[in-house]
A protein has these predicted regions:
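Crotonase-fold acyl-CoA enzyme core
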Residues: 91-205
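Glycine- (often His-adjacent) and acidic-residue-rich active-site loop
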Residues: 45, 53-92, 108
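Hydrophobic/aromatic residues within transmembrane alpha-helices
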Residues: 17, 51, 63, 115-117, ...
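Hydrophobic alpha-helical membrane-association signature
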Residues: 32-35, 82-85, 188
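Histidine-centered beta-alpha loop that forms part of the nucleotide-sugar donor binding/catalytic region
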Residues: 20, 62, 105
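Conserved CoA-thioester-binding segment of acyl-CoA-metabolizing enzymes
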Residues: 1-54, 91
């Protein structure tokens, strides 16, 4: 598969997958998740995966405008995207046999929040924030967020995120236990990149 929305690059034993729509803050059309899922089936011996976003954002959420869903009925198209593309990709990450590290700067919103937190490790810069804004547009959290968030940060804090639809800055997310220690923006990629090889070099069961 030729990739239009992501970059896939091997760095030693680490497969680096970069959401590559910086002009849209890496807003993710359904096809992007097809590409991610395809890339995850092509580890070719990689022992860790690093997820990142090009530019100043990790992922600003699903791109549902401009015909991205490709259907006249938004409800049916959204359901199809969730069941055929978004959710299967989240399950593919959960079932992957190697560690996944996400490197977050700027927004990790909506499905982008779920994608970041689905990783085994989430490295967040000082500019990062996490957002569940579905309540503001009359939708429910997607990408497994309603299952994942209560288990990461507890029911009350998950409810606060999902019912208020407010940004959770990196420092607050750290206090809540959502991710490892915050790092400076310029160090985010270095730390995330270092974690990938470290996990890749760890021993495995024969």
């Amino acid at each position: 598969m030729a990739y239009e929305h992501i970059l896939a690059e091997r760095q030693g034993a680490v497969l680096v997958l970069t959401l590559n729509r910086p002009d849209r803050l890496n807003a993710a059309p359904p096809a992007l998740f097809d590409e991610l899922r395809d890339a995850l089936t092509r580890l070719d011996g990689a022992r860790a995966v690093l997820l990142a976003g090009a530019g100043r954002a990790f992922c600003s959420g699903a791109d549902v405008g401009g015909g991205a869903l490709g259907a006249d009925d938004p409800g049916e198209a959204t359901y199809a995207a969730l069941t055929d593309q978004y959710n299967p990709t989240m399950l593919a990450i959960a079932d992957l046999g190697v560690p996944v590290v996400s490197a977050v700067r700027g927004p990790a919103a909506g499905i982008g929040c779920s994608l970041a937190l689905a990783a085994d490790f989430c490295v967040a810069s000082e500019t990062a924030y996490f957002l569940q804004a579905f309540v503001n547009i009359g939708l429910v959290p997607d990408g497994g967020a309603s299952w994942m968030l209560p288990r990461l940060i507890g029911r009350a804090r998950a409810a606060e995120m999902m019912l208020l639809g407010e940004r959770v800055p990196a420092a607050k997310a750290l206090d809540w236990g959502m991710h490892p220690p915050v790092v400076a923006a310029e160090a985010r990629d270095a730390r995330a990149a270092a974690m990938g090889p470290r996990r890749a070099a760890a021993p495995t069961v024969p």
